[in-house]
Each structure stands twice: as structure tokens, then as C-alpha cells.
């Protein structure tokens, strides 16, 4: 979104991706994550955290923080930044690193202090093959409980990513959980309440680019050209079960659109080390994301107001907002 009287910075002319040196890469803010991967993956390395959509720009992602499937292990995308350069409101080029005040107010700072122009990113080894396990749950409470059980396995590295979703199923909802590993190890699912329904081995890039098949479908049906009024909030874990159940009771499939879903992902507060990215006070929070793909502009029109209503309800229970959300925000927000 854009504030009243705001400025759009076109960074397309600053999209260079530098050489990979000692598990680091210097990237200009206008580059896309797809372009970053094109430089790092042939070296067997990837950024520790990537957004689900690889065609987002690096600078745009870092302005809001950046949440991805690996956030539960490695934090926000901004937590993978090891140095940055930006232009302040005074027109000065400023460079900063961890420990500098500027470093902490620019990352996820919404461009209020400086516009990021160049960053250095930490890289991690990329698995050759990943295994995507899909589990189906009887209700949201058991899905959230399984996510909590998997946190220790995430820390140990036995699990690379955990992402829950709730998809429309007739007049009801089907909760499902995606567990991603770098080895075919059924034992990693031991003790979970969800019923395994599929396991799919795939190249690392196919998993990182998993949003691409959906985008192709949306483009083919014309839905990609419609507005995408998404909402992302962070729920305190202690209230998550009740909050999610309450919002699902209010939602219908048409509120999300034919390809929409609700995304639920666990985020340990300690994993996120970006001060400007606001999270609830609980040690664990749950990313609650309404992924809306309306069938028409008429269907999309009421969705920003509906997003506002959802946010106002969950905020009373201690939830916080991820600012890359579609509704009109005030200075108080």
C-alpha cells in the first residue's frame, strides 16, 4: 500500500546480484528473489529465508520484514541481512551493520527512515532434494497442536519448514499441514495427530518456487489480474485456537475466492530478531493469513473492509499486523 502523499520508488534500475563469496551475496534492492536464486543455487546455496513468491523484489520484502516457510527456523528475511546500504530522507547514502541503530530501524521500517538500496545476505547450503509431506487434520486445534510438536524437530534441523493451511471443502473446511524435510524419513512425523495423505520428493528449486504453478493457473483463468486483498496477522499462541476457530466460523469459501485459503504457520518469537517487526508477547505466535483470490472486482470490493474487521477483532486478543496487508491503515495502526 501507499500512504497519502507517499512516493513510489522504482528500483528496477538497481537489480544487480553480485558474486557469491563465503556464503554471502550482495544484492541491489531492485533484484527479485528469483534472480538471487539464479546466482546462488548453482553454488549449492540459498538465502536462509525466502518469501513464498520469488518475483517479489528484495527491497520491497525487506521494507516489511519478509515471512517465509523457513521463518520458524531462521527468522524473518530481514534476519538474514548482514549489512545494508540505504538513502535517508536527507538524501545521504548510509551504510550499517548489526549493532548499528540504523540497521535496526531500516529493516522492516517501511521506508520511513531510509530506502534500502543494497544488502548483503547470509546463505545456507541448499538440499538437492526435499520431501513434502502432507497431513490432513480433523480440526484446526489438532493442526495447531501438531505444529507445536514439530518445533523441536525444526530446531534440530530434522524438519526444514512447517506450514499449515485451511482449505474450503464443500460447506466446511479441511485443515492440512505441510512438513518439509531434506530426507525421506517417516519417523519425523511420529506422534502427530494428522493423517499422512501424500509425500512428494522434488528438487529444491521446485519447492522454493512452489507458488509458480498456482500463478500460472491464475493467469490462465484471468484471476491474476484481479486485486489480491490479503491479510496477514500474528496471533499470540495462547489465544490462537479460539481466534482461528472464531474467524473460520465467520468465513465462507466465497470470502476467499476459488483458489483462496487460510495459512497458519508457527513462529517462535526468539527466531525473529528484527526490532521493527512487531509480534505478540507470547513466546510462540501463529501467522494467520487470509489468502484471497476474488473471482471479480465486485467480489474484491468489500474485502479490505472485511480485513479491517478481522484485524480489529484479533488485535483485542494481543495480535499484531504484518503491514503488507490490504486495508486502509491509520497513523495509529
Where are these regions (language model features)?
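Short glycine-rich, acidic/polar surface loops and turns
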Residues: 70, 162-169, 270-280
Amino acid at each position: 500500500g501507499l500512504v497519502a502523499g507517499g512516493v513510489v520508488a522504482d528500483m528496477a534500475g538497481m537489480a544487480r546480484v553480485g558474486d557469491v563469496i563465503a556464503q554471502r551475496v550482495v544484492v541491489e534492492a531492485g533484484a527479485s528473489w528469483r534472480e538471487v536464486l539464479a546466482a546462488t543455487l548453482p553454488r549449492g546455496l540459498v538465502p536462509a529465508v525466502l518469501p513464498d513468491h520469488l518475483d517479489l523484489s528484495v527491497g520491497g520484502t525487506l521494507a516489511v520484514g519478509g515471512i517465509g516457510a523457513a521463518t520458524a527456523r531462521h527468522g524473518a528475511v530481514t534476519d538474514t541481512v548482514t549489512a545494508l546500504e540505504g538513502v535517508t530522507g536527507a538524501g545521504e547514502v548510509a551504510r550499517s551493520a548489526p549493532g548499528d541503530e540504523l540497521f535496526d530501524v531500516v529493516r522492516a521500517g517501511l521506508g520511513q527512515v531510509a530506502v534500502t538500496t543494497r544488502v548483503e545476505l547470509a546463505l545456507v547450503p541448499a538440499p538437492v532434494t526435499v520431501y513434502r509431506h502432507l497431513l490432513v487434520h480433523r480440526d484446526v486445534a489438532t493442526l495447531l497442536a501438531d505444529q507445536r510438536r514439530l518445533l523441536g524437530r525444526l530446531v534440530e534441523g530434522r524438519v526444514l519448514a512447517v506450514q499449515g493451511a485451511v482449505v474450503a471443502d464443500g460447506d466446511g473446511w479441511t485443515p492440512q499441514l505441510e512438513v518439509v524435510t531434506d530426507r525421506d524419513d517417516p519417523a519425523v512425523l511420529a506422534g502427530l495427530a494428522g493423517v499422512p495423505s501424500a509425500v512428494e520428493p522434488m528438487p529444491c528449486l521446485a519447492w522454493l518456487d512452489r507458488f509458480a504453478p498456482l500463478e500460472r493457473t491464475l493467469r490462465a483463468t484471468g484471476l491474476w489480474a484481479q486485486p489480491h486483498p490479503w491479510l496477514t496477522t500474528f496471533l499470540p499462541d495462547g489465544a490462537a485456537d479460539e481466534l482461528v476457530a472464531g474467524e473460520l466460523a465467520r468465513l465462507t469459501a466465497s470470502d476467499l475466492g476459488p483458489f483462496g485459503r487460510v495459512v497458519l504457520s508457527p513462529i517462535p518469537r526468539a527466531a525473529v530478531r528484527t526490532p521493527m517487526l512487531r509480534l505478540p508477547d507470547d513466546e510462540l505466535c501463529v501467522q494467520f493469513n487470509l489468502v484471497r483470490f476474488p473471482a471479480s472486482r465486485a467480489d474484491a470490493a468489500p474485502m479490505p473492509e472485511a480485513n479491517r474487521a478481522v484485524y480489529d477483532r484479533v488485535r483485542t486478543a494481543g495480535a499484531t499486523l504484518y503491514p503488507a496487508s490490504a486495508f486502509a491503515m491509520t497513523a495509529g495502526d
